[in-house]
Amino acid sequence: MIHQKMIGKTRRLDFTTLFFLITLSLIVNSFIFNNLLIICIFLVFFSICILITNYGLKIIKQLNLLQNIRDTGPSFHFNKKNTPTMGGIFIILPLLLLLLIVNHYFYSMGIILLFFGSLSFFIIGFLDDYLSIKKKKNIGLRSTQKFILQSLISILFIVLAYQNGYINSLITVSNNWAIDTNIVIFPICFVTLVGLSNAVNLTDGLDGLASGCGSIVFYGLGTEIFIKGQQELIIYGLIAYAMSGLCVGFLKFNKYPAKIFMGDTGSLTIGATLGYISILTNSYFTLFIISGIFVIEALSVIIQVSFFKITKKIFKRGKRVFLMTPIHHHFELSGMKEEKIVENFWKINILLVILGIVLKINL
């Protein structure tokens, strides 16, 4: 009986286990790629996020920046009301500071684009969270307003990235294989930025889900960039590892039961930053695989809304595929515990990262 309990415990994937898994993997990567900055930058920004979140949490409580819960969500989420929010500040501000420092010592138009791109989505998320708190509703900016702002920023980034040689029609699948997409590359870039930022935002509905998956995906993206072996791209791999550290650091406070939420301030910017880095490093293919959880969450909403509208038009009464979307709510309403859903999604995300890296190496 004791042995069975010990086995059960060892199989559980929680914050501590996830942190050690990523840390050990990065130590291995440091030796494989002969670059100790890999593990160092992860641990430094992990520590920075823990320190500033621990201190900043008190300030957010004092400022009364508290979460509102939508009425249409699961009823058992109402106990999350008044949890401090806008914690994404403690993830994104260190990122922006890192980008400024990097650009100071290693001037690069790509870093400048990444800085202003991430800053722009940060501002959109900040405004959305602030207005939501001010209105005392779980709605800040209207969805059309957010989409227009996201679209304008994304189009500007794509144009500037293309003009500076960061975008071409070839999508790199592996070091030996590329696909020529012709002009389709531009809508691919647009969907990568706007789609992924909103996908992460949709995923951020359970304690620790978006921050945990974010840390895993950034780890995978950083590793993919190092596998490319292109010296000029290494800095983006290190930035991805820094973001992984920041997400894990925030996860310490965001895991169930959450002491703080990242809000749109964090989720929109995390998704956009993933998109920006993948565009600047031509990592679209791998990103699509390793971001599978985010993609599934977004697709579940699209499928639900589309199916409801189609069936309503045909049968005069809309029908649903899922109990509720995004899909993590479907599992909640099916009776699965929140912590178990998050743990399972993390496990799937880890498998997707392994798949993405294996395909990158072997294709």
UniProtKB/Swiss-Prot annotation:
It comes from the Bacteria. Its main location: membrane. Keywords: Cell cycle, Cell division, Cell inner membrane, Cell membrane, Cell shape, Cell wall biogenesis/degradation, Magnesium, Membrane, Metal-binding, Peptidoglycan synthesis, Transferase, Transmembrane, Transmembrane helix. Its cofactor is Mg(2+). CDD domains: GT_MraY. One of its GO terms (biological process) is cell division. The chain crosses the membrane at residues 15-33, 82-102, 106-126, 147-167, 183-203, 207-227, 233-253, 260-280, 285-305, 341-361. Pathway: Cell wall biogenesis; peptidoglycan biosynthesis. PROSITE patterns: MRAY_1 (PS01347), MRAY_2 (PS01348). Catalyzes the initial step of the lipid cycle reactions in the biosynthesis of the cell wall peptidoglycan: transfers peptidoglycan precursor phospho-MurNAc-pentapeptide from UDP-MurNAc-pentapeptide onto the lipid carrier undecaprenyl phosphate, yielding undecaprenyl-pyrophosphoryl-MurNAc-pentapeptide, known as lipid I. Belongs to the glycosyltransferase 4 family. MraY subfamily. This is Phospho-N-acetylmuramoyl-pentapeptide-transferase. It comes from Prochlorococcus marinus (strain MIT 9515).
